[in-house]
Amino acid sequence: MGCCFTKRRKSEKAEGEEEQPKLYSWDQREKVDPKDYMFSGLKDETVGRLPGKVAGQQFVIQDCENCNIYIFDHSATITIDDCTNCVIFLGPVKGSVFFRNCRDCKCTLACQQFRVRDCRKLEVFLCCATQPIIESSTNIKFGCFQWYYPELAAQFKDAGLSIFNNIWSHVHDFTPVSGELNWSLLPENAVVQDYVPIPMTEEFKAVRISTEANRSIVPVSRGQRQKYSDESCLVVLFADDYTTANARKLIDEMVGKGFSLVQTKEMSMKTEDAQRVFQEKASDFLLLLNKGPVIALEFNGDDAVQECHLIVNGMFNGTKMFVSEKKETASGDVDSFYNFAEIQMGI
């Protein structure tokens, strides 16, 4: 006589056995404590976050007085509310930096968008990919971002920001007052460290910082300051493995010879764009446009066109670049490219 065995069905649970809840991807994310991404109600302190400690999160700074605040990392957005007499450094911000109801603050920061509302007496060394905007604010002063530490270049990439897209001086005032100017540019000889000093506390000694212009991750440009000369030169570099390095090398050479860097831009171009900007020379560059965005540089100074040609032919022989052909048409080259760039930004 045989024995009869029955298997327990999978749907049946052994006595005392509890069904485990399902785990979803959003349940497995690392829990974020908002307190780790906030400085609030501080007074007379030096605080900050080291590289890797913010890692693209949002950050809030509020109700701080007489504080030195350093965020040595990239973030999503940062709001600064109700702060007085503070020194603030912000690494690259993917979205917006928004100051509200702050006064007597000195800052160095990089972001996609910069907004100031209900503030007075801010001094800002800025890298901003879009037009900085102020509203209901007075005595706001701007200079070009000028800062270096080893992790900063990678943080710009993580934040999706180009070091060449910086219109720091193209400020728009939403609430202008007739006969008054609510914003201005910092003195040309302003020393960044006099405004935003390198932190000397033990926590930040490991961050190898420099505020020298020739080491700044973001090229230091004149922006809308008056040009020294009537002669400018446009140089456009096309995408390859060394485009950024070549642009930096060319800037170093030209600035080292006494020329000024007025403005920079990194953006994609189509065939019709190249034909409009480069005109009869466009056919020389059409195949290069598919490789990636171009980098444009405007240099200013007497004999800028001649010197650009000498440097490009001597240092970058074999690398295709557009360089203004002669000084009589160089200003037209600059206008054609940057007018095109402004139109693209408005689309």
UniProtKB/Swiss-Prot annotation:
Q: Where is the signal peptide?
A: none
Modified after translation how?
A: Myristoylated on Gly-2; which may be required for membrane targeting. Palmitoylated on Cys-3; which may be required for plasma membrane targeting.
What tissues contain this protein? Retina (at protein level).
Q: Main localization of the protein?
A: membrane
Task: Quote the residue positions with lipidation, kind S-palmitoyl cysteine.
Answer: 3
Q: Which residues form the C-CAP/cofactor C-like domain?
A: 21-176
Membrane topology category? Lipid-anchor
**Lineage: superkingdom:** Eukaryota
Outline the subunit composition. Answer: Found in a complex with ARL3, RP2 and UNC119 (or UNC119B); RP2 induces hydrolysis of GTP ARL3 in the complex, leading to the release of UNC119 (or UNC119B). Interacts with ARL3; interaction is direct and stimulated with the activated GTP-bound form of ARL3.
Instruction: Kindly provide the name given to this protein in its UniProt entry.
Output: Protein XRP2
Q: What is the lineage of its organism?
A: Eukaryota, Metazoa, Chordata, Craniata, Vertebrata
